[in-house]
Amino acid sequence: MIPGQMLKGNLEDCVLIIISMKEAYGYEIVQKLEEFGFGSIAEGTVYPLLLRLEKQGFVVTEMRASEHGPKRKYYRITPEGKKEILSFIASFRELAEAVENLMLEVAKNEQTD
């Protein structure tokens, strides 16, 4: 499981990526996060995050009827949301490369000790 502190700064953009793949409602997004290996993330964590994404203009919402109960709020990515994803991916790749370089250096030093 991914430690919460590592997720903290990235979860919002990961949710945005999930929404970019397919319009989705809150609980569906929580399920997708679990499917992708993020572990069990509480809906109480995801809903405020979705509200922030909406306020930032990265997603728009639409209420739709559900076959299984009350209406559901579906989230759809906006052009601004797509730009945010591209920015996140570029930044994350940079970070991943720096961490990889650091880990390689540690491994190299362990071999010489």
Model regions and ranges:
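Beta-hairpin "wing" of winged helix-turn-helix
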Residues: 56-71, 76
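N-terminal helix-turn-helix DNA-binding core of bacterial DNA-binding proteins
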Residues: 3-47
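Short beta-strand/turn micro-motifs at beta-sheet edges
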Residues: 1-5, 62-64
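Amphipathic alpha-helical dimerization/coiled-coil segments
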Residues: 83-113
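Short, hydrophobic-biased segments on the C-terminal half of alpha helices
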Residues: 47-54
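A cross-family signal for key residues in well-ordered alpha-helices
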Residues: 17, 31, 51, 60, ...
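Basic, amphipathic "hinge/linker" alpha-helix immediately C-terminal to the N-terminal HTH DNA-binding motif
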Residues: 71-89
